[in-house]
Amino acid sequence: MFRPPLSNPTQKRTLLPLYANYQATPWAGFLDPDLDVDFDILPGTVMQRLYGEVFAPYTGESGTVPFGLSALFVAPKLGVNEVSSSGTGLFTVWVGGDQAVFEVLAPAFDIEATWPTTTGPSRVMLTANDKGRLTPEGVTAENVIAELIDIPSTDKIVVRLNRLDLSSTTDLAGGS
């Protein structure tokens, strides 16, 4: 179980595993030591695997693919850094199949995107924006990471990891 550090005990976790006991795995690795980003990495930020066990936020750069969802905070703006406080660079990314379901709280998803309704027969696939936040905008078969299951409120979404199963999707809702 991940817990916020004592330095910021009131900070809410922005990613909550709903179905993950057997459906998802926290994949251990390291945050890219050369990482230089001007945004916070929050639990729920889409991450890419650079090489070996080294991760960085997925920003949609050409030649990269999303790998999973961040489990930890590296958020200087919020005053929480669960990586540098350990001094090791250890980092964790949630990976899983299409049975892994997570609740994601804002601001860990793109609140400025045009979010479709989840009613009806269409599937709404998600990718990441240039800050690694989940978004329905710009989805392609190569960059999809999850499927939108529900939007319980304006600051909460429920997603199902869905990296590779596009066989029954004829149109990537929210895509280009």
Regions found by a protein language model. Give the residues of each.
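Surface-exposed, low-hydrophobicity beta-strand/loop segments enriched in small/polar/acidic residues
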Residues: 1-176
